[in-house]
Amino acid sequence: MKLRVDAESWPYKVPFRVSRGAEAALDVIVVTLEDSSGHIGRGEAAGVDYHGETIASMKAQLEAVRPRMECGIDFESLAAILPPGGARNAVDCALWDLIAKQRRTPVWELAGVANPRRLTSSITLGIDTDAAVAAGARRYAEWPLIKVKVDGKRHLDAVRLVRAACPAAGIIVDPNQAWDCDLLNRLAPELKSLGVVLIEQPVPHGEDATLHGYTGEVRLAADESVDDRAGLATVQGLYQVVNVKLDKTGGLTEALALAREARALGLQVMVGCMAGTSLAMAPGMVAGQLAEFVDLDGPLLHAEDREHGIQYDRGLMQLPLPALWG
């Protein structure tokens, strides 16, 4: 087995701002696995920045286990030598792609998804000026679900602008840990009246227990507070939805396991992304078959996408082509 690791940078159309800061481009690693017969599998990862992951740290992790991987690896042994995170995600997704190519079997079938459906993704509007948020909302007025990034100071005004421009859309609000429970309770009634259907990770990871005091009616989704199945116990009874992201789980293998266990516990599932290219969205679409909410809009945020990229029609995602992945 040959392992190749490449670093790439994908500029955004406009700088993308969330409560933690802004970025002009997304840096990713792409792992390519090639077997002795020339079959190739690819996987992309951006890593988890709030866990301190960088391109350099992910590449270092992979170089440390290169000899083991080049001797041959499967999903179980991969999970034993790499922790959850971007490095394992890239290899795990490349391995799914490789096995699909080796067996000439669609990845959906390998994952136990008999009849994959096209998914409807939300589109994300970053933190910006009133004019920019309003313009963005008008651009996506026909999309059924709009996600609005907010922070501790800018919240209701942005949601009002989106509602005015998109009267029929559902709205997801994402503070990225920027609120506390008191602010959440103050905002919740108007958020409900504005048609907000979900609030993602309102409070910081580690302060989840404060949500025992939440009095609102809008559902809450755990994002930064849950990486993989080990985090489910922390959020039960506090959140109603779990945001599954492959960079957090360490790949599609654990993402599927997390989604299935969350559903068994009575939680709904959201499948999100780290704003990658279509190569990262494709395995996300497999996990998305188990989700009530889908946020796989990464390619639309970039100035350009990969060859054979996933096509979007007002949020409706085309199933990925095998030439891309799977």
Residue map of PLM features:
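Catalytic core of soluble alpha/beta enzymes
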Residues: 148, 153-289, 296-297, 303-315
